[in-house]
């Protein structure tokens, strides 16, 4: 490895001598900021630690809901996550499908175990999200470096979502009991500047309510040669249908100095937060019509629209946004048949009688929009995005449209030829559409809103 001699360093001054009008415009003159002196911004001293949310009410059981109180042990809440232990599941030899029966959890187990989550202040909902939002949000915002770790957290692993044959069959195994973790994507969890100031809210009871799905809508009992799916019953499983689960909500609390605490408690503050809105779900049948529209009666400043056509043929097969139902593949794996493609062909956005977006092919919403305006392009089929914001995952406003000032805004979706074929049913064994496939159009909106913190309480000054 050679070193730069003194004459070589001297030649570097030639580069500096090329400074001209272009460089003056780009770099500035004598008042420009240097690259080599870092400015230090003193900030308030703090520390953080995990805390268990207590004051649980309700029953953490499948098909039930429970709520927990946000801990008052800290000054701010930085984030929250749900920890849930799945039960051990063993398929009996005497199950409905006999020696051909297999059992597995649905895709994205924690997304589907949790039907909805709501953050409330004195019973006023501040933010709520459901399974579809968890599916979509993770597809658009998950950095690739974290994806495998996230799958491990939510149970998207082979030991849970790959088919397990019945007792006595080759490859027979149990679905293990396992601790799963779901990071809850509340508005306060992505930016420390939006941390929830619980010390400023002594007059608000802050609670998180979690609704869990029934176990019958989470476990898939499927024939390993035909692909037929049967609703699971208690006699299929050793010990019957699992009921109660171990579930806890944890949060990271931040502790600040007394000076900052005193200043914070006496200051009126407006926070720009995010909320999730869900349009009424529409059942769509491409055999009746090729194009369907849904009215989007949203409110507030909408920054992004996310839409999917979900395959709802079997309630236990969740997070499926393709034309057909997955089947059991070689080696007891999950196989997506040939028609497991996007049910959407194209879509357009209309404001009253004005076309806001022309009929654009599905690649615009599933590839182009995420490429430019989201962190990630979805790895799963069937997710579509239109972002008004320059960065849909950034909590700082960078573009939106006030849907409260619009009337008759609608999304028009044209379904694909493959969806029409699958909707007719009649496919062969393991085609994924031996029975007629059913679809539902789901539309989600992410909007900005203002929370005002004043006199020890929170409220929404702009309804």
Swiss-Prot record:
GO CC term (a single one): viral capsid
Keyword Secreted: no
Top-level division of the source organism's lineage: Viruses
GO molecular function: structural molecule activity
Residues in coiled coil: none
Record key words, sorted: Capsid protein, Late protein, Virion
InterPro entries: Capsid_N, MCP_C, MCP_C_sf, VP_dsDNA_II
Localization, UniProt: Virion
Subunit structure: Homotrimer.
Annotated family: Belongs to the NCLDV major capsid protein family.
Protein name: Major capsid protein
Lineage: Viruses, Varidnaviria, Bamfordvirae, Nucleocytoviricota, Megaviricetes
């Amino acid at each position: 490895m050679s070193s730069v001699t003194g004459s070589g360093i001297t030649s570097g001054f030639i580069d500096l001598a090329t400074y001209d009008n272009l460089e003056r415009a780009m770099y500035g003159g004598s008042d420009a900021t240097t690259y080599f002196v870092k400015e230090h911004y003193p900030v308030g001293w703090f520390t953080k630690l995990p805390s268990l949310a207590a004051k649980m009410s309700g029953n953490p059981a499948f098909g039930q809901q429970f709520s927990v109180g946000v801990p008052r042990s800290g000054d701010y809440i930085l984030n929250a996550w749900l920890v849930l232990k799945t039960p051990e599941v063993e398929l009996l030899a005497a199950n409905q499908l006999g020696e051909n029966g297999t059992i597995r959890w649905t895709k994205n187990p924690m997304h589907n175990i949790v039907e909805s989550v709501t953050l409330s202040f004195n019973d006023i909902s501040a933010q709520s999200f459901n399974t579809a939002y968890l599916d979509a949000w993770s597809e658009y915002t998950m950095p690739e470096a974290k994806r495998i770790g996230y799958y491990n957290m939510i149970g998207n692993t082979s030991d849970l979502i790959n088919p397990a044959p019945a007792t006595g069959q080759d490859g027979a195994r149990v679905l293990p009991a396992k601790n799963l973790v779901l990071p809850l994507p509340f508005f306060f969890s992505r930016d420390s500047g939006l941390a929830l100031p619980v010390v400023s809210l002594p007059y608000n009871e802050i609670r998180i309510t979690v609704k869990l799905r029934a176990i019958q809508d989470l476990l898939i009992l499927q024939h390993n040669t035909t692909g037929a799916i049967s609703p699971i019953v208690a006699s299929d499983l050793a010990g019957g249908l699992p009921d109660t689960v171990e579930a806890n909500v944890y949060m990271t609390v931040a502790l600040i100095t007394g000076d900052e605490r005193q200043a914070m408690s006496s200051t009126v503050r407006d926070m720009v937060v995010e909320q999730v809105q869900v349009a009424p779900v529409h059942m769509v049948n491409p055999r009746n019509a090729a194009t369907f529209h849904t009215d989007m009666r949203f409110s507030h400043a909408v920054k992004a629209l996310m839409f999917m056509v979900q395959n709802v043929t079997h309630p236990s097969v969740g997070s499926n946004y393709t034309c057909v139902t997955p089947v059991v593949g070689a080696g007891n794996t999950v196989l997506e048949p040939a028609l497991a493609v996007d049910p959407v062909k194209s879509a357009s956005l209309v404001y009253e009688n004005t076309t806001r977006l022309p009929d654009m092919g599905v690649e615009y919403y599933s590839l182009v929009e995420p490429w430019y305006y989201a962190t990630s392009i979805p790895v799963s089929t069937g997710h579509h995005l239109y972002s008004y914001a320059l960065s849909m995952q950034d909590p700082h406003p960078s573009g939106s449209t006030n849907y409260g000032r619009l009337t008759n805004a609608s999304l028009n979706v044209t379904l694909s030829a493959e969806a029409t074929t699958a909707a007719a049913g009649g496919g062969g064994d393991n085609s994924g559409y031996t029975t007629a496939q059913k679809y539902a159009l789901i539309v989600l909106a992410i909007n900005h809103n203002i929370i005002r913190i004043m006199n020890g309480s929170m409220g929404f000054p702009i309804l």
